[in-house]
Amino acid sequence: MQAPEAAEAASQVNQSIEQVLGDPAQYEPAIRAFQSAVAAHDAAAVARMVEYPFAATLDGKQTQIKDAAAFAAAYDRIVTPEIAQVIAKQNYAELAVSGKGVMFGNGEAWINGICRDNACKQVDVRVVAIQAGAAN
């Protein structure tokens, strides 16, 4: 993609985020920080971005991860090399947006806003799912 086309596509993603989820100014920095942390294999940083409890499949079993320390300890079983590659290489302009959040790849990771008050005026953008994608 040429630069103007990439900028237009990123703008379209931001417009979709705004229409479906809320302020894209909250989402874009969270998405980029998540990608950077995964690319750097920074388990502690990724763990700080996750919403808890976090459902993960470990050793073929659904598991509830209660906190960042437990997530970081299980990081390599949650964020496999294949999943990490999808997250790190995801082009912002090609993200999919739905009511479930912002999707990386074929669903390998999802980020969404978590309401912190009844009116949903306070929102934290968090990682809500990391899993094998639909194509896997």
Language-model features: where?
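Charged, alpha-helical scaffolding/interaction elements associated with membrane systems
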Residues: 39-40
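C-terminal-biased regions
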Residues: 4-36, 47-136
